[in-house]
Amino acid sequence: MPNRIWLCGDTHMHSSISDGKYTPDELIEKCQAKGLDWIIITDHNKNAVGEKSYYSENLLVIPGAEYTGRNGHMNIYGSGLPEFDGTRPEKYEQYLSMSALAHSNGCTVSINHPFCSRFGWRMPFEDFPTDCVEIWNMFMHQSNMTCISWWERQILGGRRIAALGGSDYHRDYGTSDMLASPTTFVFAESNSEKDILSALRRGNSFITNSPDASRLVLSYKDCVQGDEIKFVPGMKVNLRAERLRKNMTLRVFNNEKIIYEHRIGSESELDEDISITEKGFVRAQITYRLRGFRKAFFNIKMALWRPKEKNIPYDTAVWCITNPMWVV
Protein backbone atom coordinates (compact mmCIF):
# COMPACT_ATOMS: atom_id res chain seq x y z
CA MET A 1 0.00 0.00 0.00
CA PRO A 2 1.38 3.49 -0.84
CA ASN A 3 2.72 5.60 2.00
CA ARG A 4 0.01 7.56 3.76
CA ILE A 5 0.06 10.47 6.20
CA TRP A 6 -2.35 11.85 8.80
CA LEU A 7 -3.92 15.16 7.78
CA CYS A 8 -6.45 17.16 9.78
CA GLY A 9 -9.37 19.20 8.56
CA ASP A 10 -12.95 20.35 8.96
CA THR A 11 -15.72 19.05 6.69
CA HIS A 12 -18.44 21.59 7.49
CA MET A 13 -18.31 25.39 7.71
CA HIS A 14 -20.11 28.44 6.37
CA SER A 15 -18.92 31.76 4.99
CA SER A 16 -20.64 35.07 4.32
CA ILE A 17 -21.68 33.64 0.94
CA SER A 18 -24.59 32.10 2.88
CA ASP A 19 -25.15 32.72 6.59
CA GLY A 20 -21.64 32.80 8.05
CA LYS A 21 -19.93 35.93 9.37
CA TYR A 22 -16.59 35.71 7.59
CA THR A 23 -15.72 35.93 3.92
CA PRO A 24 -14.14 32.81 2.41
CA ASP A 25 -10.70 34.45 2.60
CA GLU A 26 -11.20 35.38 6.26
CA LEU A 27 -12.41 31.86 7.01
CA ILE A 28 -9.34 30.41 5.31
CA GLU A 29 -7.06 32.60 7.45
CA LYS A 30 -8.77 31.37 10.60
CA CYS A 31 -8.33 27.76 9.49
CA GLN A 32 -4.66 28.34 8.75
CA ALA A 33 -4.23 29.74 12.26
CA LYS A 34 -5.76 26.50 13.60
CA GLY A 35 -3.09 24.48 11.80
CA LEU A 36 -5.51 22.62 9.55
CA ASP A 37 -4.27 20.84 6.43
CA TRP A 38 -7.54 20.86 4.49
CA ILE A 39 -11.06 22.30 4.73
CA ILE A 40 -14.37 22.03 2.90
CA ILE A 41 -16.48 25.20 2.81
CA THR A 42 -20.14 24.15 2.69
CA ASP A 43 -22.41 27.14 2.30
CA HIS A 44 -26.16 26.54 2.11
CA ASN A 45 -27.13 25.68 -1.49
CA LYS A 46 -24.15 27.71 -2.74
CA ASN A 47 -20.58 27.06 -3.84
CA ALA A 48 -18.20 29.59 -2.27
CA VAL A 49 -14.98 28.02 -3.54
CA GLY A 50 -15.38 27.70 -7.30
CA GLU A 51 -15.10 24.83 -9.73
CA LYS A 52 -11.88 23.32 -8.41
CA SER A 53 -9.94 22.86 -5.21
CA TYR A 54 -6.99 25.15 -4.60
CA TYR A 55 -4.24 25.75 -2.07
CA SER A 56 -3.94 28.84 0.08
CA GLU A 57 -0.35 28.49 1.20
CA ASN A 58 -0.37 24.91 2.60
CA LEU A 59 -4.12 24.73 3.22
CA LEU A 60 -6.17 22.70 0.73
CA VAL A 61 -9.58 24.31 0.11
CA ILE A 62 -12.13 21.85 -1.33
CA PRO A 63 -15.43 22.95 -2.94
CA GLY A 64 -18.53 21.96 -1.05
CA ALA A 65 -22.13 22.88 -0.38
CA GLU A 66 -24.76 22.01 2.18
CA TYR A 67 -27.88 20.97 0.29
CA THR A 68 -30.39 22.53 2.66
CA GLY A 69 -34.13 22.12 3.02
CA ARG A 70 -36.54 21.95 5.90
CA ASN A 71 -36.51 18.13 5.91
CA GLY A 72 -32.76 17.62 6.03
CA HIS A 73 -29.25 18.86 5.34
CA MET A 74 -26.76 17.01 3.14
CA ASN A 75 -23.16 17.97 2.41
CA ILE A 76 -21.69 17.49 -1.05
CA TYR A 77 -17.91 17.59 -1.49
CA GLY A 78 -15.71 17.85 -4.55
CA SER A 79 -14.80 19.66 -7.76
CA GLY A 80 -17.77 18.15 -9.60
CA LEU A 81 -20.17 20.08 -7.39
CA PRO A 82 -23.61 20.40 -9.05
CA GLU A 83 -24.96 23.84 -9.81
CA PHE A 84 -27.62 25.12 -7.43
CA ASP A 85 -30.53 27.28 -8.57
CA GLY A 86 -31.28 28.65 -5.11
CA THR A 87 -34.36 26.46 -4.64
CA ARG A 88 -34.62 24.79 -1.25
CA PRO A 89 -35.52 21.11 -1.60
CA GLU A 90 -38.84 20.02 -0.14
CA LYS A 91 -39.28 16.40 -1.25
CA TYR A 92 -37.33 13.22 -0.57
CA GLU A 93 -37.07 12.65 -4.32
CA GLN A 94 -35.14 15.92 -4.67
CA TYR A 95 -32.52 14.69 -2.21
CA LEU A 96 -32.30 11.37 -4.03
CA SER A 97 -31.84 13.15 -7.35
CA MET A 98 -29.19 15.48 -5.96
CA SER A 99 -27.29 12.59 -4.39
CA ALA A 100 -27.38 10.71 -7.71
CA LEU A 101 -26.19 13.79 -9.62
CA ALA A 102 -23.42 14.44 -7.12
CA HIS A 103 -22.21 10.85 -7.34
CA SER A 104 -22.34 10.89 -11.14
CA ASN A 105 -20.12 13.99 -11.02
CA GLY A 106 -17.61 12.20 -8.79
CA CYS A 107 -18.57 14.00 -5.58
CA THR A 108 -18.83 12.65 -2.04
CA VAL A 109 -22.12 12.85 -0.11
CA SER A 110 -22.70 13.04 3.65
CA ILE A 111 -25.94 13.27 5.65
CA ASN A 112 -25.57 16.01 8.26
CA HIS A 113 -26.62 16.00 11.93
CA PRO A 114 -29.55 13.63 11.29
CA PHE A 115 -30.84 13.63 14.88
CA CYS A 116 -30.54 17.38 15.49
CA SER A 117 -33.64 18.74 17.21
CA ARG A 118 -33.68 21.85 14.99
CA PHE A 119 -32.31 20.73 11.63
CA GLY A 120 -32.50 16.95 11.68
CA TRP A 121 -33.11 14.50 8.84
CA ARG A 122 -36.89 14.03 8.62
CA MET A 123 -36.93 11.51 5.78
CA PRO A 124 -35.97 7.84 5.41
CA PHE A 125 -32.22 7.48 5.64
CA GLU A 126 -31.47 3.86 6.55
CA ASP A 127 -30.91 3.13 2.85
CA PHE A 128 -30.25 6.63 1.57
CA PRO A 129 -27.36 6.65 -0.96
CA THR A 130 -24.78 8.47 1.13
CA ASP A 131 -21.05 7.85 1.52
CA CYS A 132 -20.76 9.25 5.03
CA VAL A 133 -22.77 10.40 8.01
CA GLU A 134 -21.88 13.34 10.22
CA ILE A 135 -22.03 11.71 13.65
CA TRP A 136 -20.41 14.69 15.38
CA ASN A 137 -21.70 18.19 14.64
CA MET A 138 -20.48 21.22 16.62
CA PHE A 139 -19.49 20.54 20.22
CA MET A 140 -20.40 17.10 21.56
CA HIS A 141 -23.99 17.02 22.80
CA GLN A 142 -27.04 14.77 23.11
CA SER A 143 -28.09 14.47 19.48
CA ASN A 144 -24.52 13.58 18.49
CA MET A 145 -24.51 10.75 21.02
CA THR A 146 -27.85 9.58 19.61
CA CYS A 147 -26.33 9.60 16.13
CA ILE A 148 -23.27 7.67 17.31
CA SER A 149 -25.59 5.01 18.78
CA TRP A 150 -27.48 4.82 15.47
CA TRP A 151 -24.22 4.52 13.54
CA GLU A 152 -23.04 1.74 15.88
CA ARG A 153 -26.20 -0.21 15.07
CA GLN A 154 -25.59 0.30 11.36
CA ILE A 155 -22.04 -1.03 11.40
CA LEU A 156 -23.02 -3.90 13.71
CA GLY A 157 -25.55 -4.83 11.04
CA GLY A 158 -22.81 -4.87 8.42
CA ARG A 159 -23.41 -1.51 6.76
CA ARG A 160 -20.15 0.18 5.84
CA ILE A 161 -20.94 3.84 6.26
CA ALA A 162 -18.06 6.14 7.18
CA ALA A 163 -18.40 8.51 10.12
CA LEU A 164 -17.08 12.05 10.04
CA GLY A 165 -17.28 15.22 12.08
CA GLY A 166 -17.87 18.84 11.16
CA SER A 167 -17.88 22.02 13.21
CA ASP A 168 -20.73 23.64 11.23
CA TYR A 169 -18.89 26.86 12.00
CA HIS A 170 -20.65 30.16 11.29
CA ARG A 171 -19.05 32.66 13.67
CA ASP A 172 -17.52 33.10 17.11
CA TYR A 173 -19.80 33.61 20.09
CA GLY A 174 -18.03 35.81 22.62
CA THR A 175 -14.90 33.89 23.60
CA SER A 176 -16.29 30.63 22.21
CA ASP A 177 -14.50 29.65 18.99
CA MET A 178 -15.92 26.39 17.64
CA LEU A 179 -14.07 26.30 14.33
CA ALA A 180 -12.56 22.83 13.82
CA SER A 181 -14.41 21.50 16.84
CA PRO A 182 -14.56 18.69 16.04
CA THR A 183 -11.62 17.95 13.76
CA THR A 184 -11.49 14.99 11.39
CA PHE A 185 -8.08 13.40 10.81
CA VAL A 186 -7.71 11.33 7.63
CA PHE A 187 -4.97 8.89 6.62
CA ALA A 188 -4.38 9.85 2.99
CA GLU A 189 -1.74 9.35 0.33
CA SER A 190 -1.44 13.11 -0.17
CA ASN A 191 -3.08 16.40 0.70
CA SER A 192 -5.12 16.45 -2.50
CA GLU A 193 -8.87 16.56 -3.02
CA LYS A 194 -8.89 13.07 -4.51
CA ASP A 195 -6.99 11.49 -1.62
CA ILE A 196 -8.75 13.41 1.18
CA LEU A 197 -12.23 12.54 -0.09
CA SER A 198 -11.23 8.94 -0.76
CA ALA A 199 -10.01 8.61 2.84
CA LEU A 200 -13.26 10.14 4.13
CA ARG A 201 -15.36 7.67 2.14
CA ARG A 202 -13.31 4.67 3.25
CA GLY A 203 -13.31 5.77 6.88
CA ASN A 204 -9.51 6.00 7.13
CA SER A 205 -10.07 8.53 9.87
CA PHE A 206 -10.81 9.48 13.43
CA ILE A 207 -12.77 12.39 14.85
CA THR A 208 -11.53 14.33 17.84
CA ASN A 209 -12.54 17.38 19.85
CA SER A 210 -10.07 19.81 18.22
CA PRO A 211 -6.82 19.85 16.21
CA ASP A 212 -4.82 19.56 19.43
CA ALA A 213 -7.01 16.97 21.18
CA SER A 214 -6.45 13.23 21.64
CA ARG A 215 -5.55 10.99 18.71
CA LEU A 216 -6.42 7.32 18.18
CA VAL A 217 -4.94 5.04 15.54
CA LEU A 218 -5.69 1.35 15.10
CA SER A 219 -3.20 -0.49 12.92
CA TYR A 220 -2.46 -3.98 11.63
CA LYS A 221 0.61 -4.24 9.42
CA ASP A 222 0.12 -1.31 7.00
CA CYS A 223 -3.67 -1.07 7.52
CA VAL A 224 -5.58 1.36 9.74
CA GLN A 225 -9.20 2.09 10.59
CA GLY A 226 -11.33 2.05 7.46
CA ASP A 227 -9.21 -0.68 5.87
CA GLU A 228 -10.10 -4.35 5.64
CA ILE A 229 -7.93 -7.03 7.24
CA LYS A 230 -8.15 -10.82 7.19
CA PHE A 231 -8.99 -12.56 10.46
CA VAL A 232 -6.27 -14.86 11.79
CA PRO A 233 -6.72 -16.75 15.08
CA GLY A 234 -4.57 -15.14 17.76
CA MET A 235 -4.13 -11.91 15.81
CA LYS A 236 -3.52 -8.59 17.57
CA VAL A 237 -4.29 -5.05 16.48
CA ASN A 238 -2.10 -2.19 17.66
CA LEU A 239 -3.67 0.79 19.39
CA ARG A 240 -1.71 4.03 19.47
CA ALA A 241 -3.21 6.81 21.59
CA GLU A 242 -1.68 10.26 21.98
CA ARG A 243 -2.42 13.54 23.77
CA LEU A 244 -4.46 11.76 26.41
CA ARG A 245 -6.28 13.58 29.19
CA LYS A 246 -6.59 12.46 32.77
CA ASN A 247 -9.78 10.79 34.03
CA MET A 248 -11.12 9.95 30.60
CA THR A 249 -11.89 6.35 29.58
CA LEU A 250 -10.42 4.61 26.55
CA ARG A 251 -12.23 1.58 25.12
CA VAL A 252 -11.65 -0.72 22.17
CA PHE A 253 -14.57 -2.70 20.73
CA ASN A 254 -14.56 -5.92 18.71
CA ASN A 255 -18.09 -5.59 17.36
CA GLU A 256 -20.23 -4.87 20.45
CA LYS A 257 -17.76 -6.42 22.91
CA ILE A 258 -15.33 -4.28 24.89
CA ILE A 259 -11.94 -5.97 24.45
CA TYR A 260 -9.84 -3.26 26.08
CA GLU A 261 -10.69 -0.63 28.70
CA HIS A 262 -8.38 1.82 30.40
CA ARG A 263 -9.01 4.69 32.79
CA ILE A 264 -6.51 7.35 31.76
CA GLY A 265 -4.22 8.61 34.48
CA SER A 266 -1.19 10.85 34.17
CA GLU A 267 0.11 9.23 30.97
CA SER A 268 -0.11 11.28 27.77
CA GLU A 269 0.49 8.37 25.38
CA LEU A 270 -0.36 4.71 25.19
CA ASP A 271 0.69 1.87 22.89
CA GLU A 272 -1.03 -1.51 23.23
CA ASP A 273 -1.37 -4.70 21.19
CA ILE A 274 -4.91 -6.01 21.63
CA SER A 275 -6.19 -9.48 20.76
CA ILE A 276 -9.07 -9.75 18.30
CA THR A 277 -11.40 -12.69 18.90
CA GLU A 278 -13.90 -12.55 16.04
CA LYS A 279 -14.65 -11.24 12.58
CA GLY A 280 -16.60 -8.04 12.08
CA PHE A 281 -14.82 -4.85 13.04
CA VAL A 282 -12.62 -3.16 15.62
CA ARG A 283 -12.99 0.45 16.69
CA ALA A 284 -11.84 2.69 19.56
CA GLN A 285 -13.14 5.70 21.44
CA ILE A 286 -12.42 7.97 24.39
CA THR A 287 -15.25 9.22 26.59
CA TYR A 288 -15.50 11.53 29.60
CA ARG A 289 -18.04 12.44 32.25
CA LEU A 290 -19.63 15.88 32.42
CA ARG A 291 -19.02 17.23 35.90
CA GLY A 292 -18.56 20.56 37.70
CA PHE A 293 -17.49 23.53 35.58
CA ARG A 294 -17.53 21.46 32.39
CA LYS A 295 -21.18 20.53 33.02
CA ALA A 296 -22.15 24.12 33.85
CA PHE A 297 -20.48 25.47 30.71
CA PHE A 298 -22.12 22.76 28.64
CA ASN A 299 -25.56 23.70 30.00
CA ILE A 300 -25.00 27.33 29.00
CA LYS A 301 -24.05 26.32 25.45
CA MET A 302 -27.06 24.03 25.14
CA ALA A 303 -29.42 26.78 26.29
CA LEU A 304 -28.05 28.99 23.50
CA TRP A 305 -27.71 26.53 20.62
CA ARG A 306 -29.95 23.54 21.30
CA PRO A 307 -32.63 24.63 23.80
CA LYS A 308 -34.89 21.69 22.88
CA GLU A 309 -32.19 19.27 24.02
CA LYS A 310 -30.99 21.04 27.16
CA ASN A 311 -33.09 18.94 29.56
CA ILE A 312 -32.28 15.55 28.04
CA PRO A 313 -30.24 13.50 30.55
CA TYR A 314 -26.60 13.55 29.49
CA ASP A 315 -23.46 12.88 31.47
CA THR A 316 -21.13 10.88 29.21
CA ALA A 317 -19.60 12.38 26.07
CA VAL A 318 -17.30 11.20 23.31
CA TRP A 319 -13.93 12.98 23.12
CA CYS A 320 -12.35 11.00 20.28
CA ILE A 321 -13.67 8.17 18.10
CA THR A 322 -12.35 6.06 15.22
CA ASN A 323 -14.03 4.53 12.25
CA PRO A 324 -14.03 0.72 12.20
CA MET A 325 -11.23 -1.46 10.94
CA TRP A 326 -13.07 -4.24 9.11
CA VAL A 327 -12.09 -7.81 10.02
CA VAL A 328 -13.15 -10.44 7.46
Regions found by a protein language model. Name each.
Residues 158-160, 205-206:
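Extended two-metal-dependent nuclease catalytic cores across DNA- and RNA-processing enzymes
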Residues 1-6, 172-328:
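C-terminal functional module detector
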Residues 1-112, 117-129, 134-153, 157, ...:
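A metal-dependent hydrolase metal-coordination microenvironment
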